[in-house]
Amino acid sequence: MITIPMTENGPDMDMVEKYVENDSTVKGIWCVPKYSNPDGITYSDETVKRFAALKPAAKDFRIMWDNAYCIHEISDTPDVLLNIMDECKKTGNEDLPIMFCSTSKITFPGSGVAALAASENNLKVLREKYNYEIISYDKLNMLRHVRFFKNYDGVLKHMEKHKKILKPKFDIVLD
């Protein structure tokens, strides 16, 4: 495990590029690109573009794009994160990112509903690898989430409740 320092724009991309492009034993990087802990940094457009333009020494290198806080807004002017897949397609690197998110930090930790997105090549590999790992998904939990939220607007309305609780706490710490 290699620790990469954070800057105000995200990970130190000079260091990321040095390791990823010169060391074939580096197989991946884990990123929380929006409101990344501990400083709440959202990766800049330049950082996302540099990730998309990586030329990994390892052909099986992947960017694990954990967008855990994709809708966790506490201001009226939320950070905007560039779409990593769109940028990777522009550079011919659509197989680099494996993107995911979940409702774990929205509903119940460890009991949320997750989503995964990736290129068709990556999805094929993931389907083959994980097809036999589980008998079935927790369909009752999925149903609970659908009935509770109803639709995307329902998720956003729920996040407004989170904002009302969390914003005053952030204001105290940040002021």
Regions found by a protein language model. Give the residues of each.
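PLP-dependent class I/II
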Residues: 1-175
